[in-house]
Amino acid sequence: MQAPPPEHCPGVESEQAGKGSACAGCPNQGVCSDPNKKLEDPGKALVVESMKDVSNKLLILSGKGGVGKSTVTSLLTRYLARSNPDSNFGVLDIDICGPSQPRLMGALGESVHQSGYGWSPVGIEDNVCLMSIGFLLDSVDDAIIWRGPKKNGMIRQFLSEVDWGNLDLLLLDTPPGTSDEHLSVVSYLKDDTNPESLRAVMVTTPQEVSLLDVRKEINFCKKQNIPIVGVIENMSSFRCGHCGNSSEIFPAKTGGAAAMCAEMGIPLLGSLPLDQQISKACDSGEDLTEFKNVTTEALEGICSKIMASFS
């Protein structure tokens, strides 16, 4: 990069590099549009410096919206923090247009503060911190109507201007699909000297309509050379609180996550049921991982596999 990027720069990794409307008049336009010249985004060095004390990063992905990815992110974080009290965990909500983590983590109404090292993330527990664009809005009902370049710029700020401190694991709650946000965060966090430090977990429900998009997400990770820890099947069954019988609310017509994992050679980390207690806790921001139930039993196995993948 020969000159500072314009405000709405699509990024050198984007297919729109040198072609977008923001590129008109930029001194770098000719360089960015040349496929034979590999460029390094100047923001990458800032991210590397800011994240130097973050040991591992875990992308929580799903191709389909509404499969409970944000809920799973909060549950994993809570359980990991409770079962590993000597480790530090962070959550970065990069679903810019639909931030859910402030509510799920019981931090609605909190705000971030500026320190000498950048934005200070919101403390959730002694060993858990959270950053989300939700903390920067005047109202929880405010709509964020941004194009890709502006969202990418916000993600770059979250990675380079937040004082994360020493973290053993940073979990990133991502939007559905394989959009600009995914390309940006991967380009900033991939470390060729330590490729195992960035990994991914897929979240799906048993229906084929969800599995179809998760397959695309898996192929995205393979193309980007991101190791996949495994797949979590969410909402796999519902256990009645009165009779104790289990029902499949979303039947696995094509074999569910287990069949897909076998087909694509990806580990199945476990399955999480539909749980009324968890549903209520998500709305109130409570932490229910301290209680023993079918969900926390499943989380125990899933979280142990995740931690083992980074050891």
From Swiss-Prot:
Binds 4 [4Fe-4S] clusters per heterotetramer. Contains two stable clusters in the N-termini of Nubp1 and two labile, bridging clusters between subunits of the Nubp1-Nubp2 heterotetramer. One of its GO terms (cellular component) is cytosol. It comes from the Eukaryota. Its cofactor is [4Fe-4S] cluster. [4Fe-4S] cluster 2 binds at C240, C243. GO terms for molecular function: 4 iron, 4 sulfur cluster binding; ATP binding; ATP-dependent FeS chaperone activity; iron-sulfur cluster binding; metal ion binding. It holds the Pfam family ParA. Keywords: 4Fe-4S, ATP-binding, Cytoplasm, Iron, Iron-sulfur, Metal-binding, Nucleotide-binding. Heterotetramer of 2 Nubp1 and 2 Nubp2 chains. HAMAP family: Mrp_NBP35, NUBP1. This is Cytosolic Fe-S cluster assembly factor Nubp1 homolog. It comes from Drosophila yakuba.
